[in-house]
Amino acid sequence: MPDPTLSEPSAATADAPPFPRCPDPADFRAEAASYDRLAEVGTWAGPRYRMTYRVLGQGPPLILIPGIASTYRGYATTLNRLAERFRTVIYDYPGEHPDDGARLRRISHDDLVDDVFGLIDHLNIGRAFLVGLSFGTTITLKALHREPRRFPKAIVQGAFARRGFTTAEKLALRLGRLMPGTTARLPLRRAILTYNSKNHFPAILEDRWHYYLEQNGLTPIAPLAHRLDLVARLDLRPILPAIPVEVLLLQGNEDRIIARRHHDELLAALPRAEGVIMPLVGHQPHFTHAEALAQVIGDWLLPCAPEGCPNEPKA
């Protein structure tokens, strides 16, 4: 005889309230439009280029150092939510605007770090949280090493200390620095992006996939090749043990661009690092998991008060 407890719900189960429905994913284009409407746009006439930056929100300063490609609009959904708790700042790299005066051949990776400190001084920021993504993590780590007292905590996602490039790839980078236009005209761009990231955008996020392709295609080729060339010559391993700042390492467990070994190398070398492996996440959580990414960043940088977390449901 079948066990009736397996086929008939108990009174307690029948009376239990239904699980709340997950909210629909945010509309990325609407989020970007809102960010454009609300963010303050400024320009800093730095020693190497006229830097365009955007500021949104009130609270402790948080500087987001972006990845190697795409535009600030790809981070808009994350920034909109972080702006509820932080004064967020994001900026454009040299060469992103044709009139910014950047002479890319003269700009080193250390210069990019200098520019972060120049922007901080320009905005009269004392101490700030740093959040670096992908290529931006290399600038973040160097900044933490150079002046750790200015940064109480930092978060890096898709981080690495070094990347290997083949001779053919290095040659392609040199040629790329001479090409006009944006990455939208590069052959095989969509096929490569699809291989690396498409499976991390389920059907419910189809609009975000198209937006990602669009924004990625707006990246100018020459400055992108310049940044890739900087990465090809970079090795941060010697400075990692001397970084005393608390660092949270976020790594997608399905990241096809930055392999897990890079995360493990950083976790072993940084004295005060914590690591989080994000399930079912690739290299673009600011697109695929923007809302959750913002919550993780906010809750780790500003831990809960003794009376409870702001995101916890009330009993």
Residue ranges and their predicted role:
Residues V245, A259-A268:
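Short alpha-helix in the alpha/beta-hydrolase fold that links the catalytic acid
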Residues H145-R146, F151-T182:
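Flexible "cap/lid" loop of the alpha/beta hydrolase fold
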Residues M1-L62, R85-F86, L302-A315:
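Alpha/beta-hydrolase fold catalytic core
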Residues A45, Y49-P98:
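Conserved HGGG/HGGXW glycine-rich cap/lid loop of the alpha/beta-hydrolase fold
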Residues I90-V131, Q295:
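Active-site loop/oxyanion-hole signature of alpha/beta-hydrolase fold enzymes
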Residues I243, L249-Q251, D255:
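Short beta-strand/loop motif that positions the catalytic acidic residue
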Residues F165-T167, R185-P241:
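Conserved alpha/beta-hydrolase catalytic His-Asp/Glu region
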Residues A273-A315:
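Catalytic active-site module of serine/aspartate enzymes centered on a nucleophile-bearing elbow/loop
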